[in-house]
């Protein structure tokens, strides 16, 4: 089976309780494989300061965020299989997992899957897009053996 090539960058001070490169690889493969094979991407795990800076610079939001996606747009004439970069903030992921009562690795997996789908062009700005993206995320997460990541939200709003 073809693999998504992951360039993993750990630039956070505390690397305890982070997913392994093999876990990130498996999650990214499952999210990306139906669309592409043999693509390369960067997953950069950062602290709040870097996430905050990037979120402010690129999204105008003055706070750290869980995952930022930077798709790579290659000119048509260039043959390059670079999908893009994910920047995931360790502290935000840990805090959200705790607040939402989710297992930490399940939330890490969700952030990788969510970010990969953004790199593939999915979005959640419009309701219809959000529904499609969340449905796909749920399907991928369940195929990886995790619960529906939106279950608690659906219970609260359903």
Curated annotation (Swiss-Prot):
<dbReference type="InterPro" id="IPR002036">
    <property type="entry name" value="YbeY"/>
</dbReference>
<keyword id="KW-0698">rRNA processing</keyword>
<keyword id="KW-0255">Endonuclease</keyword>
<dbReference type="GO" id="GO:0005737">
    <property type="term" value="C:cytoplasm"/>
</dbReference>
<dbReference type="GO" id="GO:0006364">
    <property type="term" value="P:rRNA processing"/>
</dbReference>
<feature type="binding site">
    <location>
        <position position="114"/>
    </location>
    <ligand>
        <name>Zn(2+)</name>
    </ligand>
</feature>
<feature type="binding site">
    <location>
        <position position="124"/>
    </location>
    <ligand>
        <name>Zn(2+)</name>
    </ligand>
</feature>
<keyword id="KW-0479">Metal-binding</keyword>
<comment type="function">
    <text>Single strand-specific metallo-endoribonuclease involved in late-stage 70S ribosome quality control and in maturation of the 3' terminus of the 16S rRNA.</text>
</comment>
<comment type="similarity">
    <text>Belongs to the endoribonuclease YbeY family.</text>
</comment>
<keyword id="KW-0540">Nuclease</keyword>
<keyword id="KW-0378">Hydrolase</keyword>
<dbReference type="GO" id="GO:0004521">
    <property type="term" value="F:RNA endonuclease activity"/>
</dbReference>
<keyword id="KW-0690">Ribosome biogenesis</keyword>
<keyword id="KW-0862">Zinc</keyword>
<dbReference type="InterPro" id="IPR020549">
    <property type="entry name" value="YbeY_CS"/>
</dbReference>
<feature type="binding site">
    <location>
        <position position="118"/>
    </location>
    <ligand>
        <name>Zn(2+)</name>
    </ligand>
</feature>
<dbReference type="Pfam" id="PF02130">
    <property type="entry name" value="YbeY"/>
</dbReference>
<dbReference type="InterPro" id="IPR023091">
    <property type="entry name" value="MetalPrtase_cat_dom_sf_prd"/>
</dbReference>
<dbReference type="GO" id="GO:0004222">
    <property type="term" value="F:metalloendopeptidase activity"/>
</dbReference>
<dbReference type="GO" id="GO:0008270">
    <property type="term" value="F:zinc ion binding"/>
</dbReference>
<protein>
    <recommendedName>
        <fullName>Endoribonuclease YbeY</fullName>
        <ecNumber>3.1.-.-</ecNumber>
    </recommendedName>
</protein>
<keyword id="KW-0963">Cytoplasm</keyword>
């Amino acid at each position: 089976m073809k693999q998504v090539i992951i360039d993993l960058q750990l630039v956070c001070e505390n690397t305890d309780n982070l997913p392994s490169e093999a876990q990130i690889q498996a999650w990214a493969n499952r999210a990306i494989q139906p669309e592409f094979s043999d693509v390369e991407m960067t997953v950069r795990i950062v602290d709040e300061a870097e996430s905050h800076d990037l979120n402010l610079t690129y999204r105008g939001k003055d706070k750290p965020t869980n995952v930022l996606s930077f798709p790579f747009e290659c000119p048509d004439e260039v043959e390059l299989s670079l999908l893009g970069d994910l920047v995931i903030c360790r502290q935000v992921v840990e805090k959200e997992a705790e607040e939402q009562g989710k297992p930490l690795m399940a939330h890490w997996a969700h952030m990788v899957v969510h970010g990969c789908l953004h790199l593939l062009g999915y979005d959640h700005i419009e309701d219809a897009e959000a529904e499609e993206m969340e449905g796909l995320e749920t399907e991928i997460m369940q195929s990886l053996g995790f619960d529906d990541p939106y279950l608690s939200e659906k219970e609260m709003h359903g």
